[in-house]
Amino acid sequence: PGPPAILPFTRLQGGPMDYTPGIFQTDIGKIVPWGKKMQTTICNQLGLYVTFYSPLQMAADFPEHYEPFMDAFQFIKDVAVDWDKSIYLEAEPGEYIITARHPKLSSLNKAAEGVGTLKDGKKGVVSNATKFVYAFPDDATVEDLWHAEPHDVWYVGGITDENAREVSVKLDFLKPGVKYEATIYCDAKDASGIPDEHYNAQAYTITKKTVTSKSKLKVRMAPCGGFAVSLRSL
């Protein structure tokens, strides 16, 4: 087994790291003559946003490489970059890891013009405020914004080595008695991130379903693949 499945157990033990995820054109030979195929899939790239902690995140590919896959790119637009709770659901060093994370208020990957005066008396930006900032007066506080957000949000990500895996993800970390909409980004049945004649890194499926804390999600990770899930309370 090799990277990136080993990194959460080695380098990331020392703190956050910049891994520049989000590569959707995984055949680098189509960009430069000397390029090679990456050991990854699109869903592996999405899973990195959750399994690797990096509070300053990026989308590392060219904009034109995202255009054919805007439905998958939606996860990059949605996912947070900093967390107030992290749960490691399953893991085997160097082989695979599945992580669930709950975002901090100020970490969701959205932009806001401004939110007025914060608790310390300074003007500031709270990035989760986009859709309701206009409704608050100049003396709005971070606490005001937090209580105005009606949804509980979680993200789950998984990555694997060269071995395909089918996993059953327990959602018992969700609030009991609350329904959530799960958006599941998963490797397709014929996906593969191994650079051989079966290479098919851009094959994925996106499904939505209603779940609770008693639910389990069955997902497949292709060789060198992964998955990502966004969960939003209804």
Positions of predicted regions on the chain:
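Glycan-recognition and catalytic regions of carbohydrate-active enzymes
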Residues: 64-155, 195-200
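Accessory carbohydrate-recognition regions in carbohydrate-active enzymes
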Residues: 20, 27-28, 34-37, 64-95, ...
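Short secondary-structure junctions and interdomain/linker hinges
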Residues: 54-59, 82-86, 228
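Glycan-recognition surfaces
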Residues: 1-65, 109, 191
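Structural beta-strand/beta-sheet cores of well-ordered domains, especially the beta-sheet scaffolds
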Residues: 15-17, 44-48, 54-56, 96-98, ...
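Short edge beta-strand/loop segments characteristic of extracellular beta-sandwich folds
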Residues: 157-159
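A general structural signal for short secondary-structure junctions and capping/turn motifs
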Residues: 9-10, 40-42, 50, 100-102, ...
